[in-house]
């Protein structure tokens, strides 16, 4: 009898010990002296196919930082860098970013796990269509759940960092925030709470709404001029003479592109730079573009109207800036033959089937992996707005443009193909994930007011019932005046709106952490009482 009682009694002592440490204050009483970037790294043997374990395993890499960790039973702050090799995103382990800041607040350890098929976490030695079959949404989400449930963390061999014994908090931004939201929906009951910054939750193949927040937030005279430029480009490419079309391509340095849609796409690309602007930035490529167009001096945050400029001058200014500042070295890639010229346009050419972009199956080709994700289950293709809506993205770019590229990059190999070719659509994805219709539990969403990704988020103005309302179990914070994932970086705390959002979010996560220990102490006490009676 004693040996059966010993385990629950010791477990209760551990949890109550953690409670006594955590409940009075979630902040460490003394800031640890160890401020090194990393505490260590590990290798996890991950299943290639979670429905067929016999397929085998691969080495999934992870890193951890225990600078603020309070010991066994203390929280785990979980993060994945999504579509980036982990070695390029290890700063997310530190308190210069939100995961590290939360860890500091709740005395947690940060654990960063690399996404399958990126960086060093490769199931196969090449990225053929057949090998990419295991890069599917269910496999990706199952990776992180399986990791949390079964990993033996090197810094806690006691086993008390299991999700049943300690709260695992998943923090994500951008694509990884979408994974956060979809995990909460499809794989609940492993992670205790979630923080999703800039999560696109409603799948869209024709994502023209991406443009809207940019149009609302950018300097309005720059917006008007860009709308006029894109309208002119579309008119020339749709109804101009062959000479006029070629002249326009030459003006922008894009004469080597044979497909008009590729040229239109290239001329629309600088607009996407709006997404990257952070409140702490003092100079951005986007503001540089607007300044060049109007010979003005806009800051990255200014949104007022400027003076009107003659359209021909505006067009010439944009062409000069594009050709001399944006295009040079855009496509330069030394390891690809033909891509070494300063003004190469090879990365923009989607019809040159001899291009190495179509044949590079090496596991270092992150662009191919991301293309697969987009073609398989993620979508969110930026397109031109409907004809009755002003656009800053060419209307020549529609879902067909992207789907054609999917077919060329990922030829069918036997029965192996990508999601869209197999019948996956945005509608089927939303039926699976819930899209805009969701009722979450202990998940916090944040979105920037002028973030293009807001249009697919819970705060979207395009949501049929309007932006989703915040609840106690699913708090939603709209950060005024900022773009994408601004609350992920401590340097952005210079912005009042970002600072308040971060403080509110961290306080909410802290309360949920306390809830875990409170609820689990009651459950353990009840279970132990029942066990002793019997």
From Swiss-Prot:
GO terms for biological process: proteolysis. SUPFAM superfamilies: alpha/beta-Hydrolases. Its EC number is 3.4.-.-. The keyword Zinc does not apply. Pathway: Mycotoxin biosynthesis. It comes from the Eukaryota. The keyword Protease applies. The active site is at residues 174, 451. It is an enzyme of class 3 (hydrolase). Keywords: Glycoprotein, Hydrolase, Protease, Serine protease, Signal, Virulence. One of its GO terms (molecular function) is dipeptidyl-peptidase activity. Belongs to the peptidase S28 family. Serine protease, part of the gene cluster that mediates the biosynthesis of the secondary metabolite victorin, the molecular basis for Victoria blight of oats. Within the pathway, vicPa and vicPb are probably involved in the processing of the vicA1 and vicA2 precursors. The pathway starts with the processing of the precursor vicA1 by several endopeptidases including kexin proteases as well as the cluster-specific S28 family peptidases vicPa and vicPb to produce 7 identical copies of the hexapeptide Gly-Leu-Lys-Leu-Ala-Phe. This is Serine protease vicPb. It comes from Bipolaris victoriae (strain FI3).
